[in-house]
């Protein structure tokens, strides 16, 4: 369906949990262990109900996020049941990759088509520094297993000043021999991210163009989503840029979000929305739930205002919202 600005909203991002098995520095406090109690999370049946009603009004693609979605029990059955919904054309997962390698075959067999894996460095010591408790080899193993099982892979990378800027060329080489899309995501001022200085994607692109032959005269192509892509001569995969801060893409936004507690967010930045979990637990019918979702989608704001200090800003951390 369309929102009031005429954008076609066909993509649902739904967070299964705020829990994570890493503590990435720009996402979560080092010693954080105060997560949402299980009885406040949407149940898997509630999640499935939301997906069904969203599908009935035009949602075609579902992405499961977190926190780390793979720490949520029952995810295989959830994907299996979402895959049975006729209107849903694609099920995707955003993950840190630590647990994925040993699960991807089963996930794929039950309907998972794509994964986005967060990876900011190829150096073990830096990986430990940024994630605080992670192991790089597990992520690289997960990428390998995804390719073996024909699950399409995108790698999401955040470049931080004075941390991994010198690895840009090494990181894009992941897309050289493999059909992997690597996307540079500009750091957004959410939660712990406000404490770091990111690098703009225009600067990253200039670094790449100095060393690689960018095809199509360096012009970028926006596909179905916020990323603009370039092709590099000899590369099997593409390089993408998600530039939320320097190149607002809100006019093409096609998504709606639901947090682990069932709060439907119309925009990542804005705090407004409606709690679907509470409505369901109060006994509303499927038709009533559908109408609430339709109204929420229709009222989606025109754009974010990350660069402004707004009273309407969502103060929660990214892992609480759904990354």
Swiss-Prot record:
GO terms for molecular function: 4 iron, 4 sulfur cluster binding; cyclic pyranopterin monophosphate synthase activity; GTP 3',8'-cyclase activity; GTP binding; metal ion binding; S-adenosyl-L-methionine binding. The keyword GTP-binding applies. [4Fe-4S] cluster 2 binds at residues 250, 253, 267. It is an enzyme of class 4 (lyase). Its cofactor is [4Fe-4S] cluster. PANTHER family: MOLYBDENUM COFACTOR BIOSYNTHESIS PROTEIN 1, MOLYBDOPTERIN COFACTOR SYNTHESIS PROTEIN A. This is GTP 3',8-cyclase. The lineage of its organism: Bacteria, Bacillati, Bacillota, Clostridia, Eubacteriales.
């Amino acid at each position: 369906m369309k929102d009031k600005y005429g954008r076609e909203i066909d993509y649902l991002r739904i967070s299964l949990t705020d829990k994570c098995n890493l503590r990435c520095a720009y996402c979560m406090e080092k010693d954080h262990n105060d997560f949402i109690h299980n009885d406040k999370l949407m149940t898997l049946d509630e999640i499935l109900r939301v997906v069904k009603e969203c599908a009935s009004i035009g949602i075609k693609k579902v992405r499961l996020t977190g926190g780390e979605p793979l720490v949520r029990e029952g995810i295989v059955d959830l994907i299996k049941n979402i895959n049975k919904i006729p209107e849903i054309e694609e099920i995707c997962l955003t993950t840190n990759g630590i647990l994925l390698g040993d699960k991807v075959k089963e996930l794929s067999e039950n309907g998972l088509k794509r994964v986005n894996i967060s990876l900011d460095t190829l150096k073990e010591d830096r990986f430990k520094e940024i994630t605080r408790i992670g192991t790089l080899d597990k992520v690289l193993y997960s990428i390998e297993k995804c390719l073996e099982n024909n699950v399409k892979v995108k790698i999401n990378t955040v470049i931080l000043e004075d941390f991994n800027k010198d690895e840009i060329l090494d990181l894009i080489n992941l897309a050289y021999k493999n059909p992997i899309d690597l996307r540079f995501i500009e750091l957004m001022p959410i939660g712990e991210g406000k404490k770091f200085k990111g690098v703009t994607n225009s600067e990253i692109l200039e670094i790449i163009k100095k060393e690689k032959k960018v095809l199509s005269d360096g012009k970028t192509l926006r596909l179905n989503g916020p990323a603009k892509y370039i092709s590099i001569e000899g590369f099997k995969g593409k390089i993408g840029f998600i530039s939320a801060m320097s190149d607002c893409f809100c006019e093409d936004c096609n998504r709606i979000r639901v947090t682990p507690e069932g709060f439907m967010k119309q925009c990542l930045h804005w705090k407004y929305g409606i709690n679907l979990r509470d409505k369901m637990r109060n006994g509303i019918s499927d038709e009533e739930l559908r109408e609430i979702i339709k109204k929420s989608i229709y009222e989606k704001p025109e754009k974010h205002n990350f660069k402004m200090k707004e009273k309407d800003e969502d103060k929660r951390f990214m892992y609480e919202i759904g990354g």
